[in-house]
Amino acid sequence: MIGTEANVLDRILAERAARLKVAGATFGSRLPSLRSAPLVPLASPAPSGVAPGAGEHAPFQPAAQAHGPALFEIKRRSPSRGVIAEGLNAVEQAERYHRGGARAFSVLTESEWFGGSLEDLIAVKERFPDCAVLRKDFLQLPEELEVSFRAGADAVLLIAAALAREDIAAMLEQAAALGLAALVELHDRADLEKVAPLKPTLVGINSRDLRSFKVDKLTPPALAAEISWNCRLVFESGIGGYEDAYFAGCSGFHGVLVGESAMRNPERVPEILAGLEDAYGVARARGRSRVSACRGNPRFWGELASRRAALQMGRARPLVKICGLTTAADARLAAECGADLLGFVFAESPRRAEAALLEEIADLRCLKVAVVQADDARCSHQGSAHRRSGARHGRHPDGSTDARAAASPDTDTDTRADTRADTGRAELQPEVARLLERGLLDAVQFHGGEQPADCLALAYPYYKAVRVRDARDLELACEYRSPRVLIDAFDPERAGGTGKRINPELVRQAAERGALWLAGGLTPENIGAIVAEYRPELVDVSSGLEGAAGRKDPDKLKRYMEEIADVCTV
């Protein structure tokens, strides 16, 4: 397994180019002179209408996006995870996927780093001639596409980071001449700018950075929002099960490419396919949806990621959430001062918001989040760690929580149980459900004893707040499948509003796990030092800006934003 600091992509490309020069485009494999297998389309044409990023308020119609490719990968090892299944029989793995409903496969043919070969591709296509097969490799020359075609590939992967624009253009032209689909893979804005003039019709966005091998599930929706042409989108990496597939579909992606998690757990294929179906509305139309009917803004995570990207291009400040708002005047002041998210508590608290407030501020462009707590007695409790954490969660959640950090797993492996909506009686407050469905709220922050299997059953989009007493709770936070998890300081009496700050060592550990969201105990006096030390992705404040409970002090709010701007000036 290679350390994440190494630029593995450059090493793979250099070593492969040397082998290519010696062995040629077949890498020594014996191929048929003519293709015998039928060409199977990888994806239907992109739907007409708005492009993926045609404005943040573009209509979202997931039912029209169904039938995108769901690709399941066949590989023996990887640079990030080492050996997965060294003695793997590629055909047998494809058979496992096929039994679960898969009809498209991604076959790694790179030998040195992934343990694959063209023989694997040939064998899989011979066994499943009616299924679509993608050749996944670090292709470098147009003549490699003819080799792929003869070997039986129906599609090829073109990695934008590995190719010059003129090479991508030549390979797209060659693929079209052969009848092959070309999945053009992006990782960042530089890749997007490189391929934009070419307008590829099938685009994969990888949540795993090939240079560091870290995963960030917000990368694909952020890049998708910037695509200006009509195309089909495939979410690559970070898909561990049902909820991840549902997230991808709700984020506007037409399909997924699933790697290590499917390799290790091929029984996950049906739930991943079901997650896509539910996101597209197919299962709901048939009366079989597994998720709550309470849906807010499906583009919430994409819009949040786009805001993050915009901030990183200028003054690289964190996202700012102002929580515990109870008046329109405070909400408007927060928006005027530059807040990215506004938080509203819907639980017993001196900061409880009224539904009428959301009506009054419907014109504000900030993302709006409800802070809620499902009744612990109605939430499922799976495992002693969950019960232990659930017992700690108080009954008075507050946006002014003590300290939170986002802990984002850096792998698409998920050994946990399916997190579909099967938890029974837990329900979202009716007023919050109505506000979500009317578009007056964008998302929900669950702040109670909700377990990983509860959250998606209650509402979407959501993220979870977990109260942390020690490092074990940081591990618990990673069990939730939302792209970010808020981590709150533990208090035996209240779930929030205490003004306490989390142990600095726990904050440091959380920051090392992934993008850090930090809140609670934040004030204009300490925010500059905190941002400078921990570089959080998001800071969340409530009581630290108050003159009285539920009422913001305008001077404190303005000074808070100024302190953040000062420390982040570049």
Predicted regions located by residue number:
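An N-cap/entry alpha-helix motif that binds or orients negatively charged groups
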Residues: I2-A85
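Conserved, mostly hydrophobic/aromatic
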Residues: I12, F72, Y97, S148, ...
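Catalytic beta/alpha-barrel core
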Residues: F105-F114, A132-L141, D154-R165, L180-R189, ...
